[in-house]
């Protein structure tokens, strides 16, 4: 069996997550190719997407081992800053909002009730017309519902712990590949709060 193979892309270097099909590759000209990582997904809150883009930009500027060490330090700083801002309630509701599309009418969700559906039902209770195809914006809050539509939310209700978990899941894939432990960074962030 003879097959012709072509080179599709040449990476200066790549960072692989432990999960399949999740990686970040830096092309020769510095562009960064991100595949399957949480920080790139549409429904990730804007605050985390922005921090993820900062991280990607820093990795795109690596040309040497010294640059790589500097990028690791910057990434650690980016994650610590996000963590601190979450703890201090410095993000706006818009920065924390998830936006997920309703793929079917509300009444068609029978077995499970995803978070965006819970938020959509709260909007409907307030008199809003909700249809399949609509993007539902919500934030994670303390309390039994666990979510609140963005329009009804108050910054004091935000469940900071849930957002810390989201921060971890967004960055941990890349941090692991870079040899950085998430809990280590958070330990530094907590110690820094004393100074």
PLM regions and their residue ranges:
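DNA-dependent DNA polymerase catalytic subunits
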Residues: 1-195
